[in-house]
């Protein structure tokens, strides 16, 4: 049994816990502790009730400083300094670092010094970590000696499997990406101050351009794609699910049917459970709570002049990513034991 702790119990931290119980991986992974500065009553309440993902079915209650989920006992901690966390005493194998604030190797090593054996960051990280993993594409790079690993971003997990398939079958010359991302909690409900002037504006009233490093994230997973992609991102007034508009120029001449067939075969084969394919007339809310990293919308595939291909990809930017956190952590343990 893998003993894990969650540091930071926000949108991703809570999704990881819920996904663990819904995915069937609870027999492999046990959440021993949650470190979160919020009040225990709020931690338990937001575990039970979620506007986006609905009510959590297992019985949850608070007893002293512990959250009980059925027969499982999870210690609630409120320690702002990761170096002071009791990971050694708790025999923690992996910390899911989900604060969004601890992103480099030096900061994550506070967990290691506190006694955790490994750290998995739920965010793109600095280049000094042992590896950045998009599960389904490059988890084979994990090694026993790796202690600090990044799970990349939700959008990197969404787009990289598709680029990988296209490149292996047709060759990718270059690409341009627009991420159409649901609002996030670094935005304002009503106009308020923020260092990013666009993010001073009410999230529910505008389509808001934001910076993105998605193109650089692709390069980290697929180094041969260096300087081939650029990306922009906009936030839109929905609370979950993201769409990606991907345009790529291919080496080979293709048509819509060929592109869709290759992607559908990949979704049913090598990337089963990671990549999806649909030709139904769906909208964003239909992909809420979808555990896959990416779903290709075959109805929106377009080809211009035989080599310029436009695709529409969907992902649940919370739930899909949380499920990949579980998968990557299991792969880390498998590599450590090999």
Swiss-Prot record:
What's an example GO cellular component term for this entry? cytoplasm
Which InterPro entries did the record assign?
E4P_DH_bac, GlycerAld/Erythrose_P_DH, GlycerAld_3-P_DH_AS, GlycerAld_3-P_DH_cat, GlycerAld_3-P_DH_NAD(P)-bd, NAD(P)-bd_dom_sf
Q: Which PANTHER family match?
A: GLYCERALDEHYDE-3-PHOSPHATE DEHYDROGENASE 2 (PTHR43148)
Indicate the quaternary assembly: Homotetramer.
Q: In which pathway does it act?
A: Cofactor biosynthesis; pyridoxine 5'-phosphate biosynthesis; pyridoxine 5'-phosphate from D-erythrose 4-phosphate: step 1/5
Q: What name does UniProt use for this protein?
A: D-erythrose-4-phosphate dehydrogenase
Q: Identify the enzyme class.
A: oxidoreductase
| Listed Gene3D superfamilies | Dihydrodipicolinate Reductase, domain 2 (3.30.360.10), NAD(P)-binding Rossmann-like Domain (3.40.50.720)
Query: Which GO terms label this protein's molecular function in UniProt?
Result: erythrose-4-phosphate dehydrogenase activity; NAD binding
Give me any GO biological process, just one. pyridoxine biosynthetic process
Q: So where does substrate get bound?
A: 153-155, 199, 212-213, 235
**Residues under site feature: Activates thiol group during catalysis:** 181
Provide the protein's localization.
Cytoplasm
Q: Which residues are named in the active-site annotation?
A: 154 (nucleophile)
SMART domains referenced in this protein's UniProt entry, alphabetically: Gp_dh_N
Purpose of the protein: Catalyzes the NAD-dependent conversion of D-erythrose 4-phosphate to 4-phosphoerythronate.
What family is it from?
Answer: Belongs to the glyceraldehyde-3-phosphate dehydrogenase family. Epd subfamily.
Sorted alphabetically, the keyword list is:
Cytoplasm, NAD, Oxidoreductase, Pyridoxine biosynthesis
